[in-house]
């Protein structure tokens, strides 16, 4: 009976571990991270915490070009680098795919150490032309009752601002970024109806030689928005490109 009790206890411990940890990296999973971060920030009231989210640009290409085994090696190394300074006030997790999260005291965050860690990760691809771009968003926790999922969203909003900037690896969240994100999502939500309502218009801007002779024209697109007026490409082209929707505008115009 004692042996059965011990076996049952060990199985229970293993089941709890599987339910709370990522099987590949051994880090906490998303749900456990949310729970533990909420508990920690409310336990240490005198500590200001950062919540940091990281992502690897175009990680799917690593799996496609180098194979799943190489992709898993990168994820495991990323996990080790993220969790390289453990303490009772540091929590690290793999949220999903190539997305990781870290919560730690503000005074323990070191940008130089982050840059060094990213360089270490990039060495996985030394000797070939593939450039690994890892980027992070940092959110300072001010409202300890805010849902951790919202904190993660805000850190990711900051991270997304440097997704295509290979010279930068860390970005900090502020409320202005949230306003921009909301505006971008609003435009994306209006894009499909705008196509159906023929709100996009192409203008041809003449190009002339020095002698005044015409040599062609440049096609310029304007969004004739029903409530915002005429929007120039600067207001929506980058948003559509980042969302992978620019091809729909190309098909519509041409």
Regions found by a protein language model. Name each.
Residues 79-83, 110-128, 153-156, 253-254:
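Alpha-helical scaffold within the catalytic cores of cyclic-nucleotide enzymes
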Residues 50, 97-103, 128-160, 168-174:
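A short glycine-enriched loop-to-beta-strand structural element that forms part of the catalytic core
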Residues 16-21, 26-50, 57-83, 87, ...:
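Conserved long alpha-helical elements within nucleotide-processing catalytic cores of c-di-GMP signaling
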Residues 36, 183-239:
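Active-site core of bacterial EAL-family cyclic-dinucleotide phosphodiesterase domains
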């Amino acid at each position: 009976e004692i042996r059965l009790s011990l076996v049952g206890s060990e199985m229970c411990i293993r089941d709890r571990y599987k339910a709370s940890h990522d099987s590949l990296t051994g880090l906490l999973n998303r749900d456990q991270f949310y729970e533990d971060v909420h508990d920690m920030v409310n336990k240490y009231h005198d500590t200001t915490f950062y919540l940091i989210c990281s992502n690897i640009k175009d990680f799917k290409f690593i799996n496609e070009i180098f194979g799943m085994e190489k992709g898993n090696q990168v994820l495991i190394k990323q996990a080790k680098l993220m969790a390289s300074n453990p303490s009772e006030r540091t929590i690290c997790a793999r949220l999903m795919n190539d997305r990781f999260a870290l919560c730690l005291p503000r005074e323990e965050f070191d940008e130089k150490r982050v840059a060094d860690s990213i360089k270490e990760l990039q060495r996985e691809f030394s000797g070939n032309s593939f450039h690994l771009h890892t980027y992070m968003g940092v959110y300072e926790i001010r409202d300890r009752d805010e849902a951790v999922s919202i904190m993660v969203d805000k850190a990711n909003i900051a991270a997304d601002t440097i997704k295509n900037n290979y010279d930068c690896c860390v970005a900090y969240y502020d409320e202005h970024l949230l306003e921009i994100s909301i505006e971008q999502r609003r435009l994306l939500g209006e894009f499909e109806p705008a196509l159906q309502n023929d709100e996009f218009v192409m203008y041809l801007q003449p190009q002339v030689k020095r002698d005044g002779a015409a040599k062609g024209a440049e096609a310029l697109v304007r969004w004739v928005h029903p409530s915002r007026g005429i929007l120039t490409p600067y207001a929506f082209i980058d948003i559509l490109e980042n969302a992978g929707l620019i091809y729909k505008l190309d098909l519509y115009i041409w």
